[in-house]
């Protein structure tokens, strides 16, 4: 298999979920081996490049925020990264004029649409993957996440909320481009009505609304969105969407199975750090042409290993 990039540039404008600021973003084709990178065009100088890597993850409160050595940040990258994974985009330069990726409708679907409109082209460089060789796990109270060996890439996620509108949900999916688009990409981020004021007081969710999030009422029994849910278990499917995006920061596509229980951005990033801290837990492999087990693509491991 070969690496892939966009056929042409394409952009969008929206608001940041947490900042509430209007932001314009343009996705550009990129050369093979350059990976996924963000460029803050509102900041002059070379420090404006922010690599999309696990080692660049800083703040994980309610989102995944990347930060480079110069202190330049790009927040809420997980939905876009999930879409890039779902479309198997290896190399892309993302120009953005603010500190946060636009939330769009709260899912990965708008970003998938942008990529489909731009088109995708194969490049000469072969695609490589990180093959999980043994179980790696992280536990933080009731939150756990693990990676185990597998011939493909699959995700199982479990959540359990006191709110009866959510309650306990579990979802498993073998991830290919088709299953991601149909079963995961449209699941929106979600929150609780009574938490909005607290989040905004801490500088979060300032751009959140019923147009870009599923909101559960203060009793925990009802979804406030007039259009209801896109999937019966949309909440857990969105957690899968987040996990796919966060795992795409690994530095190469994964050949393994991810299992998350109440896990969030912080736990998944801790899991990647634990994986790369153990050289016996993984190996780099070239994905054979026509491989049925080919996982989502990401950027070459050499970049991640130096992080």
UniProtKB/Swiss-Prot annotation:
Write the Enzyme Commission number(s) for this entry.
3.5.1.108
Identify the Gene3D superfamilies for this entry. lpxc deacetylase, domain 1 (3.30.230.20), lpxc deacetylase, domain 2 (3.30.1700.10)
The keyword RNA-binding belongs to this UniProt entry's keyword annotation? no
Active-site residues per Swiss-Prot or TrEMBL entry? 265 (proton donor)
A GO BP term here is: lipid A biosynthetic process
Q: Which reaction does it catalyse?
A: a UDP-3-O-[(3R)-3-hydroxyacyl]-N-acetyl-alpha-D-glucosamine + H2O = a UDP-3-O-[(3R)-3-hydroxyacyl]-alpha-D-glucosamine + acetate
Q: Name one GO cellular component term.
A: membrane
Keywords in UniProt for this one?
Hydrolase, Lipid A biosynthesis, Lipid biosynthesis, Lipid metabolism, Metal-binding, Zinc
Pathway given in the UniProt record: Glycolipid biosynthesis; lipid IV(A) biosynthesis; lipid IV(A) from (3R)-3-hydroxytetradecanoyl-[acyl-carrier-protein] and UDP-N-acetyl-alpha-D-glucosamine: step 2/6
Could you say which residues bind Zn(2+) here?
79, 238, 242
Q: Do the record's keywords include Zinc? A: yes
Top EC group: hydrolase
Q: Name one GO molecular function term.
A: metal ion binding
What family, per the record? Belongs to the LpxC family.
Q: What is this protein called?
A: UDP-3-O-acyl-N-acetylglucosamine deacetylase
Top-down, what is the taxonomic lineage of the species of origin?
A: Bacteria, Pseudomonadati, Pseudomonadota, Alphaproteobacteria, Rhodospirillales
């Amino acid at each position: 298999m070969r690496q892939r990039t966009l056929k042409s540039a394409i952009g969008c404008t929206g608001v940041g979920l947490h900042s509430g600021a209007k932001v314009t973003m343009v996705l550009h084709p990129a050369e093979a081996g350059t990976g996924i990178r963000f460029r803050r065009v509102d900041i002059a100088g070379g420090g404006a490049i922010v690599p999309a890597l696990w080692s660049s993850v800083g703040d994980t409160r309610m989102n995944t925020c990347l930060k480079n050595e110069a202190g330049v940040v790009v927040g809420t990258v997980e939905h876009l990264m999930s879409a890039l994974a779902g479309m198997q985009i290896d190399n892309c330069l993302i120009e953005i004029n603010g500190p946060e990726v636009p939330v769009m409708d709260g899912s990965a679907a708008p970003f998938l649409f942008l990529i489909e409109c731009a088109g995708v082209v194969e490049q000469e460089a072969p695609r490589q993957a990180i093959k999980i060789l043994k179980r790696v796990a992280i536990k933080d109270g009731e939150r756990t996440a693990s990676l185990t060996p597998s011939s493909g890439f699959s995700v199982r996620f479990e959540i359990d909320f006191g709110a009866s509108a959510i309650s306990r949900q579990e979802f498993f999916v073998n991830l290919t481009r088709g299953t991601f688009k149909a079963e995961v990409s449209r699941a929106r981020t979600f929150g609780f009505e009574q938490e909005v004021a607290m989040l905004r007081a801490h500088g979060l969710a300032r751009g959140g609304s019923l147009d870009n999030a599923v909101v559960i009422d203060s009793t925990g029994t009802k979804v406030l969105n007039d259009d209801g849910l896109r999937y019966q278990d949309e909440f857990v499917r969105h957690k899968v969407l987040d996990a796919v995006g966060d795992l795409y920061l690994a530095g190469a596509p994964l050949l393994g199975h991810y299992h998350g229980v109440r896990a969030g951005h912080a736990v998944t990033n801790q899991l990647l750090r634990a994986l790369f801290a153990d050289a016996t837990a993984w190996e780099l492999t070239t994905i054979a042409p026509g491989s049925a087990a080919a996982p989502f693509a990401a950027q070459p491991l050499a970049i991640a290993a130096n992080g």
